[in-house]
Amino acid sequence: MVLRLSKAEWFTSKVSATGLYSVPYKRASQPLQQTLRQYFGGLVHDETPMVRRQAANNLAKFVKEMNTAVVIEEMIPLFQYLASDDQDSVRLLTVDILIAIAEEIPKEQQPSHGVLLTSLQSLFEDKSWRVRYMVADRYEKVPGIAYCATVALLVR
């Protein structure tokens, strides 16, 4: 059902599908998990901002269902794509995705993934006040990366 909704023509079906991915993911076989991730990636890259917004809204929940290797290899690029979206309503939702990714990656591995620190800094400096506000509002929830970002900004 999730895959069928994701392939539908109308954006309303795709929007509905984004919230359903985390439910069957854990119980699915490896090949089906791969398929689910590919279809979700398609929703992240959808041409409709409403679909991308809901994909950004639900990616954090989806990330929590995955193992660390999958998060690093496949979800960080999706996060980066959403973080560079032209719609600020999509970019502001990436703060929660960053938090979910940071929680899934062990703290000792986070410095080796400079992309998280770079992404946090770019969200701090975003042109939209709504995105900057969201980062400030959720700053204390960003484990490990927040400390590295603070040190990096102070050293500048």
Annotate the PLM regions.
Residues 1-6, 30-44, 69-83, 108-124, ...:
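HEAT/HEAT-like alpha-solenoid repeats
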Residues 5-6, 20-27, 43-44, 58-66, ...:
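Hydrophobic residues within the alpha-helices of tandem HEAT/HEAT-like
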Residues 9-10, 47-48, 86-87, 127-128:
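Short inter-helical turns and helix N-cap capping residues of alpha-solenoid HEAT/ARM repeat scaffolds
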Residues 11-13, 138, 142-156:
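Short, compositionally biased segments
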Residues 17, 36, 55, 74-75, ...:
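N-terminal alpha-helical segment
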